Amino acid sequence: MPTASPTDDLFLGIDLGTSGCRAIAADDRGVIVAEQRASLPASRRAGGGVSEQQADAWWRAVSEVIRRLDTGLRRRVRALAVDGTSSSLLLCDAQGTPCSPALMYDDTRAHAASDQIARVAPPDSPARGAGSALAKLLHLLNGPAGRTATHDLHQADWIGGMLSGRFGVS
């Protein structure tokens, strides 16, 4: 693997998927100088379209891949990018504590919410499906977590909040 100069600034990319997390540190020329991986537990799947993960498992995986990077490399990180599975959503409080499980991209239980959306959304709107982020949000807000949550966040947004201490900014 090519190496960067020990004084080069590094940029860290964190990729969260459904089965694992990967971190790559690269220099400003795009040379990858370090890579780490961690596994995630499988999503909980149940009847009725349920597909959930616990956000705490995401955080443990992200923390693990960052911790595995050499300390000298971590000190040189100047910017960070996080991506995650699209349409994976959770509710949390102002401090980022999850108030709900994370409904994963393939969770399609929000049929009542998607029926509500279908009454007002254009026929070709992606918000109309039971797996849409809007349908998931309405479903969660109508449950117990909706009474205590202050933020609805996608996977990458929650991880960004955990890393920065700022939630609800994206």
Model features per residue range: what roles?
Residues M1-S100, T148-T150:
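N-terminal glycine/serine-rich phosphate-binding loop of ATP-dependent small-molecule kinases
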Residues R67-S170:
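Glycine-rich phosphate-binding/catalytic subdomain of phosphoryl-transfer
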